[in-house]
């Protein structure tokens, strides 16, 4: 059901090659000295790339987004996010990373979140967390994310994480980190995931491997 809702609310053809969008008439802050800023300017997007920034851009075949009275600027980049934990964002606010042996730190991130809450996640829970986390970040102006994904308890969990990240419609890097349990296929499932979801490096969602593969035992 969440997938159906996502498909029905995102703009048609989002990020697809050849789809042109003109953001028109906004106050453009390019953050690039070579491009400059415009009190009233336009931004032309072709597929997933910005191809022109300037005043009075002619692009008659484009979908037009009227930006008069608004600021147009590059989105923020989040370099480290665990999107599968979106619904847990208020949990363990005062916890430390790992158990240091002190009684007051018995409730720590690794044991409580990764070894506790995440173990009962179903694939549909992963998808909803990924999708909602992505949409919420878009609403806050974050248009690119490095998703440190540690929820690979089964191939179905992995698929749900990727599809939720992708379906939010923004640029994202899927970080394939660990999972636990008898059905976990980490890291050997990486070949299937790469072939099924990341056959091209020139797409909105791309893949990197997690650092655990360099730890003895993997």
What are these regions, as identified by a protein language model?
Residues 17-19, 60-62, 68, 140-143, ...:
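Short coil/turn connectors at secondary-structure junctions
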Residues 12, 151-218:
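Metal-coordinating catalytic core of metallo-dependent amide/deamination hydrolases
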Residues 26, 43, 48, 69, ...:
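Divalent metal-coordination and catalytic microenvironments
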Residues 4-21, 27-74:
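Histidine-rich, glycine-flanked metal-binding segment
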Residues 75-86:
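Histidine-centered catalytic micro-motifs
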Residues 87-126, 169:
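Active-site gating loops and adjacent loop-to-helix segments of metal-dependent hydrolytic enzymes
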Residues 115-150:
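Hydrophobic alpha-helical hairpins/lids featuring a short glycine-rich hinge
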